Amino acid sequence: MEYKYNSDTLMHGVGFNFSKFESILSHGILSLECGKAENVRINRSFKGHNKDDEISMVRYLYIDAYDDFDIKLFNKEGAYYRYILNGISFIVEDVQFETQKAHRVDEVLVKNKVELDKIKGIQISDKYKDALLEDLFYFPMSKNYENIKNIGEEYIRYMASYGYEVNINEYKNLINELRYTYNALIDASKEDIEDLEDDYEDVLADLNEYMAQNISACFRKKFGYDITLYDLVIFLRNKNKVNLPIYIIPYTREKGKAK
């Protein structure tokens, strides 16, 4: 089953953040400002260029590469590759957007909120469809410690809602190590930055491994076996009583087409 995109079709990625995924199924896609107004907790993944009343999205029109398009540059600069192919995403239609202030080549900005009736489908790339939960990455490669900490706390609350408690001391040790590394990185001289960036990424990888094991254990406890990403997306969609089709999209893109 393939979705029939048009030039104004938009996409919004949530990574593998199942808490955010469920929140959108209940409330629509909210900006930080709307989240506060509606008492819905919204966490940033990155310190982006969008303001608190704006939502970052990808416009389908901008991902259709021309014959002379440098696909390596697109993968580096494009939001589609980073945030749509590498996670769960929503298809959005019939909303107004702005292009002038967007940061990435295929990014647009939507004001305030996307209502549920504007969301037309869910997307997962074929690379991750059958992946087990323990094999996914749950934190963005962000150099913003506060964002990472907020997302980690969100995951802990989310797992608690399913009756699963993490080893909080282990989490605190990892998040504190990330904070120490982050502070050292902020204060570093130019000569030390590269090594400290590597240290930061190593700690973030350890934190992701910790969270992946716990999220996997949380849903293993619920279902009695290890489920795939696709299985969980179906379960969460049905749990929230949302009748949205799920589309599997190709992970690999070539010049001018998807493969």
Task: Label each PLM-derived region with a short phrase.
Residues 2-27, 37-38, 51-259:
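Active-site and NAD+-binding cores of ADP-ribose-processing enzymes
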Residues 28-32:
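Short glycine-centered helix-capping/turn motifs at secondary-structure transition points
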Residues 33, 39-47:
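Short, surface-exposed loop/strand segments
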